Amino acid sequence: VDQRLEGHEDDGVTTILCLGDDPFSLDQGEGGLAEQIAAKTGATVYNGAFTGTTMAAQYESYNDGYILDAFSFSYVADALASGDFDLMKQAATYSYDEAFPRTTAMLEGLDMNAIDIVCIMYDGSDYINKRPCDDPNAPESIITYTGALREGINAMQAAYPHIRFVVMSHTFCHTINEEGNFENGDRVDLGNGTLSHYLQKELDAASDCGASFIDNFYGSINEDNYLDYMTDYIHLNDAGRELLARRFTDISFLFIFLYLN
């Protein structure tokens, strides 16, 4: 038996918590990504994603002028690990998105002991918003893409050792230049590397944390097929969400099912 499961009582139900941004938070209906994962796996799935957020925070310490940081990955993960949602609840009252207070309340009410899997997916928003990819001198810096991932997973893992983590990478996307034209996210470096650089660093960070990793960049939606799966420069259509849900199910769920049983 895995030591991380020691002392943990299995309730017989596989329960998944999805964290991230638009791939999970937009279009939460039958065609939604979390809903399709639930349909394909038979698991109970909770959707704790926030639209328009990023993995990395913008500021090193919280700034009331930028409430989205309170819903970036490390802040959400720390709230789940500590049970202290005060900052998220306060910030949610200033959000124009009515889903923010609702999702925050759902997360606060979750029994994390019942969660078996945390699935994390952010699209290319960190790249587009020029969030630093990593800081070799501060591997858990929350203002970097990989630092926030490490800090957040480590915080939740320390609080709930039984939880298994799955990191789903971003897909292909474009950035939009000053003239309003699309530019290939894997050819244009906005200052912190191209999309494939972010992918490799995310893989390294996931490996550091013992998380499973699913490559959606080379493995799912790329520059050759994105027109079939995306509505614009970054957002997925129903077919795109179905493809990612199928990839999650095919790759990780079988391994995790064996791990949990």
What is the meaning of each model-derived region?
Residues 149-154, 199:
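Generic structural signal for well-ordered alpha-helices
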Residues 11-13:
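Acidic, glycine-anchored loop motifs typical of Ca2+
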Residues 119-131, 153-195:
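Active-site segments of SGNH/GDSL-like serine hydrolases
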Residues 28, 38, 42, 123, ...:
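Sec-exported extracytoplasmic/periplasmic mature domains
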Residues 22-26, 132-143, 188-192, 229-235, ...:
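Second-shell loop/turn segments in exported
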Residues 17, 23-135:
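Conserved SGNH/GDSL esterase-like catalytic core that processes O-acyl groups on lipids
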Residues 44, 163-166, 212:
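Proline-centered loop/turn at the N-terminus of a beta-strand
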Residues 64, 170-261:
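Catalytic His-Asp segment of secreted/periplasmic serine-dependent ester chemistry enzymes
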